Amino acid sequence: MASFPPSLVFTVRRNEPTLVLPSKSTPRELKQLSDIDDQEGLRFQVPVIMFYKRKLSMEGEDPVKVIREALAEALVFYYPFAGRLIEGPNRKLMVDCTSEGVLFIEADADIEVNQLIGDTIDPGFSYLDELLHDVPGSEGILGCPLLLIQVTRFRCGGWAFAIRLNHTMSDAPGLVQLLTTIAEFARGAEGAPSVPPVWQREFLAARQPPSITFQHHEYEQVINTTTDDNKSMTHKSFFFGPKEIRAIRSHFPPHYRSVSSTFDVLTACLWRCRTCALGLDPPKTVRISCAANGRGKHDLHVPRGYYGNVFAFPAVVSRAGMISTSSLEYTVEEVKKAKARMTGEYLRSVADLMVTKGRPLYTVAGNYIVSDTTRVGFDAIDFGWGKPVYGGPARAFPLISFYARFKNNRGEDGTVVLICLPEAAMKRFQDELKKMTEEHVDGPFEYKLIKVMSKL
């Protein structure tokens, strides 16, 4: 477990934002989003960032020019991203495919990649506003660009690719599909993308008549009595390598250590530490919501190339006192229950709930949402400069933590977790986490690797 040194000071020179349009004419039409896409809980912008080191074979190539031209080519196939969202009857979202383009910013910074990526990543990317400028008037959901991209060159020859996505358009795998297409064109590919994009958002439209077949704890409308001010929130990132995961597993009885995935163990640990840090009353209802990918579910049959949202975040309910004081096995089993709820039928039940209940926001009170992006593919996007030294979400949110794949300076592969908590709770969280990751209950042990699919 490690945290980043104090924020660096550096200067970024940005050109005026421009709009990148598809390189060829595209259809002018209206396209409805699915009833999973346009739920209230996805009507926000999510930032992703990738850092690339200098590559000798790419000397003389300007990443700004390469990305801008590849983006224009990709938008021919992903032309809805060049449009704007409008709202129809009953708040139904639609893309007006206007070919207005996506926002693009060219920038230079007097800093090096290695100064930004240390033993872990900067907590909350305190410099994110420098590498992904919030263009005034672009932050809305309706009538605004659906993508904002900034390419920043560093003095070392490395560079950063930062993108802000209107989450109603795509989930993480959908965004990776778009980025992969941009990367293919950046490396000189011609013709169509290797995976042709599929719109077909009616695939996840509500059924007629709607039929809510599950109890959805993640959408229960509960009065939030918490008074934390989001302005007092602080961000930190934590690295979990083999040593840290072994330490967490050592808190389980020997017979239990090999039967749970790293995701299950890590999520249970974080949920417990977070619950303790927030000082919640023991009887208070708490939830864990695990973002779960519907792709690959035998009862869903998602079309190959579909880039809309295909995930839900099924939740289980417990009490703060149970999570804080019960055995860690109990917490792991609760996490497993949440994951097990995700099926194709569950996702269709969510779509039906959205149109029946008026697209409710996910539960805020006592909820903790975790999203595992370690196997989504952000860390494999190659624009010609090789794989990024970091690729993944750029910021946590008060209720949401993201997991991303990361290799620290010692060459250890692991998971970096972005955490956002009130300032007063963050210190307690770190203290609780230290107990879990640095105190061994007994000696070393062996466990078999449990493979799990990404949950976003």
Curated annotation (Swiss-Prot):
It holds the Pfam family Transferase. The active site is at 167 (proton acceptor), 382 (proton acceptor). GO terms for biological process: alcohol metabolic process; fruit ripening, climacteric; response to ethylene. It is an enzyme of class 2 (transferase). The gene is AT16. Involved in the biosynthesis of volatile esters which confer kiwifruit flavor. Alcohol acyl transferase that can use a wide range of alcohols as substrate to produce esters. Exhibits benzoyl-CoA:alcohol O-acyltransferase activity. It catalyses: 3-(methylsulfanyl)propanoyl-CoA + butan-1-ol = butyl 3-(methylsulfanyl)propanoate + CoA; ethanol + benzoyl-CoA = ethyl benzoate + CoA; butan-1-ol + benzoyl-CoA = butyl benzoate + CoA; 2-(methylsulfanyl)acetyl-CoA + butan-1-ol = butyl 2-(methylsulfanyl)acetate + CoA. It comes from Actinidia chinensis var. chinensis (Chinese soft-hair kiwi). Expressed in fruit. Its EC number is 2.3.1.-. Induction: Induced by ethylene in ripe fruits. Belongs to the plant acyltransferase family. InterPro entries: CAT-like_dom_sf, Plant_acyltransferase. PANTHER family: ACYL TRANSFERASE 4, OS05G0315700 PROTEIN. This is Alcohol acyltransferase 16. Keywords: Acyltransferase, Transferase. It comes from the Eukaryota. GO terms for molecular function: acyltransferase activity.
